[in-house]
Amino acid sequence: MGFQIAIDGPAASGKSTIAKLLAEKLGFDHLNTGATYRAVAVYLHEKGLSSSSAEEEIENVLKDLKIDYVNGRVYINGEDYTEKIQSPEAGVLASNFARLEVVRRHLVRIQREICDDKNIVVEGRDIGTVVLPNAHLKIFLTASLEARVERKLKEYQKRGLKVTKEEVERELISRDEQDSKRNVAPLKPAEDAVIIDTTSMSVEEVLDRILKLVRERMNT
């Protein structure tokens, strides 16, 4: 078994930035589980399905699904979905489908297969509680809504997407509510997670703190 690091937290808390940099620093693999959920959600949507579709219909589509995550790009049945999952709509679709037990069951199995026997940094919303409950280090990142809105807005603007601050705030509030209140694997810190509030911390400060924790765990 490799050394597994779980990083959880709400949208725009800094998970992706930190997880990617941490993996690079350590020479570990990196998995963004949110990207796998968005890709599957977009794929199901393209197949004409919604979160209110019959479970059997969704099961039939998912049972033979193949997901690959390579160098930050996500592939479904060999097709690159990376660009398709960048829109706010993809995030909303992902939150809707992620509430379904049938979707989470398939994705958790696939995510565990990707992580098996690897030194890996895995980011998401239920990594420390569901996907990798025995991870060597569990981190839960959080930040104020205001800070997260600013980060998400900059991210969208960098991609050339025209969205207002109000739209981003509504999106995050909606996603927070869905993520924390869903019946299956709600967003919450694992009991043994280290909680880090990134509101007033720089990326370097967060990274340094986690690297220190990694070194401590590796030496015990």
Swiss-Prot record:
> Looking at the UniProt record for this protein, which Gene Ontology cellular component terms does it annotate, in alphabetical order?
cytosol
Reaction it catalyzes: CMP + ATP = CDP + ADP; dCMP + ATP = dCDP + ADP
Q: Which residues bind ATP?
A: 9-17
User: Would you identify the family this protein belongs to, as annotated?
Assistant: Belongs to the cytidylate kinase family. Type 1 subfamily.
> What is its subcellular localisation?
Cytoplasm
Q: What is an example of a GO molecular function annotated in this UniProt entry?
A: ATP binding
SUPFAM superfamilies found in the cross-reference section: P-loop containing nucleoside triphosphate hydrolases
State the species of origin: Thermotoga maritima (strain ATCC 43589 / DSM 3109 / JCM 10099 / NBRC 100826 / MSB8)
Stated EC number for the protein is 2.7.4.25
Which keywords has UniProt assigned to this entry?
Answer: ATP-binding, Cytoplasm, Kinase, Nucleotide-binding, Transferase
This chain's protein is named Cytidylate kinase
What parts of the sequence cross the membrane? none
Source superkingdom: Bacteria
Determine if Manganese is one of this entry's keywords. no
Cite the PANTHER family for this sequence.
Answer: CYTIDYLATE KINASE (PTHR21299:SF2), CYTIDYLATE KINASE/PANTOATE-BETA-ALANINE LIGASE (PTHR21299)
One Gene Ontology term of the biological-process aspect is: pyrimidine nucleotide metabolic process
